[in-house]
UniProtKB/Swiss-Prot annotation:
It comes from the Bacteria. The active site is at E245, C279. GO terms for molecular function: aldehyde dehydrogenase (NAD+) activity. This is Putative aldehyde dehydrogenase SERP1729. The keyword Oxidoreductase applies. PROSITE patterns: ALDEHYDE_DEHYDR_CYS (PS00070), ALDEHYDE_DEHYDR_GLU (PS00687). Coiled coil: none annotated. The keyword Protein transport does not apply. Pfam families: Aldedh. Its EC number is 1.2.1.3. NAD(+) binds at G201, D202, G203, S204, G205, V206, G207.
């Protein structure tokens, strides 16, 4: 049992104002695995005051000092590798291999990328007699989701520290323990008091007062569109800057010159990775009519090899859905797919055989999907693929862009000119050609209803900065 019922404020572990707690459920067992503090407005006020008090000092710290701080964090993060992997496996239900190779590694990559970005980042620029200065925006409120407990927290924290902005972090109450370990890391390496503050709790008790606090100058949020909209509304009252990374319904365009088996394996991975609980999941798979039958044979074979199971069992690739609420939502979407006329090709409702305990869903493929069906337009956040056929490339691009989202897109094939044309044509913030993978120094963010702003590397640092021009500085 993990019991962490204190908040981390101004460099100390302190009692939460309410004295109340929240149970954290292990999704693989459906049992309580720990408790965290249920914070409230009083906790938020203390945390924001601590951050505001240190703001000017941290803003004026040198680039070298902040780089050294990030370097210390990188080293201690590596020292806590096993603790982070264990926490993520327990709270998220991620298989041990996924906790290590995806979650732990992505967090490390972001701290490293922010540290390295400081080697060349230009905080000042001379333009003739004038000076352009980039300086920390002020106290930043960070609200992070449950599906990537280290990735989403690390990329925001690393950028804020690099920029010189103190923060108040509210991690998801469903996966809070990785963030608590990060707090322990920061405490050990000597992050200055007030620069990092952790307030656990729920959205109404912590997220809302954080978004509305007059001393908070920026809100950075990753999560659902409706919640992002509410944060924008609250932040708009005093014109806070807002950075949002929201949902997606990403297209995966398969070209007609592709190696079919390779395409089947690649598209399968993009759907089942992290149990489909990925905002960039390529769940709309667009297949040329000419290779449809060969692809369906290959993708069914690929899905049949995916092992769903308990996170600590050897060979498990896909763990449980995060919660009963989310599991029920995935089941509802599968039912909608059937009821709206899509053909169930693989998987379907219910749990995999032998997995009655835990929120395990069956990896599922729908075929003959119309792009206007619910399962093709709404983010499911589960391992559900929608296969849509197309007759020509223009039609594929039109289908790909016929969505309110624009977070990611994928294309796989052989002809380089066609691959590049498709990549440029998809209306999304990040595109992968032939499973190239996203490096942590590339910008990450979405078009349309997938968000505002960009994160990762130097682009992430920019989000936490204000720009000042000083005319006549060099006269």
């Amino acid at each position: 049992m993990r019991n962490f019922t204190k908040q981390y404020i101004n460099g100390e572990w302190v009692d939460s104002a309410s004295g109340e707690t929240i149970d954290v459920i292990n999704p693989a067992t459906e049992e309580v695995m720990g408790k965290i503090a249920k914070g409230n407005e009083e906790d938020v006020n203390k945390a924001v005051d601590a951050a505001d008090k240190v703001y000017l000092e941290f803003r004026h710290s040198s680039v070298e000092e902040r780089r050294e701080l990030l370097d210390k964090i990188v080293k201690e993060y590596q020292n806590r590798k096993n603790d982070l992997i264990e926490a993520i496996t327990d709270e998220l239900g991620a298989p041990l291999s996924v906790s290590e190779n995806v979650h732990y590694q992505m967090g490390l990559n972001h701290f490293t990328a922010a540290r390295d970005a400081l080697d060349s980042f230009q905080f000042e620029e001379q333009r003739g007699d004038d000076l352009v200065v980039k300086e920390a925006i002020g106290v930043a409120g960070l609200v992070t989701p449950w599906n990537f407990p280290t990735n989403q927290t690390s990329l925001k924290l690393a950028a804020a520290f690099a920029a010189g902005s103190p923060v108040v972090l509210k991690p998801s109450e469903e996966t809070p323990f990785a963030a608590i370990i990060l707090a322990e890391i920061f405490d050990k390496v000597g992050v200055p008091k007030g620069v990092f503050n952790l307030v656990n709790g729920d959205g109404s008790g912590v997220g809302n007062p954080l978004s509305e606090h007059p001393k908070v100058r920026m809100m950075s949020f990753t999560g659902s569109g409706p919640t992002g909209s509410k944060i924008m509304e609250k932040a708009a009252k005093d014109f806070k800057k807002v950075s949002l990374e929201l949902g997606g319904k990403s297209p995966y365009i398969v070209l007609d010159d592709v190696d079919v088996e390779e395409a089947a394996n690649a598209t399968t991975k993009k759907v089942v990775n992290n149990t489909g609980q990925v905002c960039t999941a390529g769940t709309r798979v667009l297949i040329p009519e000419s290779i449809k039958e060969d692809y369906l044979t290959a993708v069914k074979e690929a899905f049949s090899k995916v092992k769903v199971g308990q996170p600590r069992e050897e060979g498990t690739q896909v763990g449980p859905i995060i919660s009963k609420k989310q599991f029920d939502q995935v089941q509802d979407y599968i039912d909608k797919g059937i009821n709206e006329g899509a053909e169930l090709f693989y998987g379907g409702p219910g749990k995999p055989e032998g997995l009655d305990k835990g929120y395990f869903a069956r990896p599922t493929i729908f075929i003959n999907v119309d792009n206007h069906m619910t399962i093709a337009q709404e983010e499911i956040f589960g391992p559900v693929m929608s296969v849509i056929t197309y007759n020509n490339l223009d039609e594929a691009i039109e289908i790909a862009n016929d969505t309110k989202y624009g977070l990611a897109g994928y294309v796989i094939g052989k002809d380089k000119d066609t691959l590049r044309h498709v990549a440029r044509s998809i209306e999304a913030g990040t595109i992968e050609i032939n499973e190239a993978g996203r490096k942590p120094d590339l910008p990450f963010g979405g078009y349309k209803e997938s968000g505002l702003g960009r994160e990762w590397g130097d682009y992430g640092i920019e989000e936490f900065l204000e720009v000042k021009s000083i005319a006549g500085y060099f006269k």
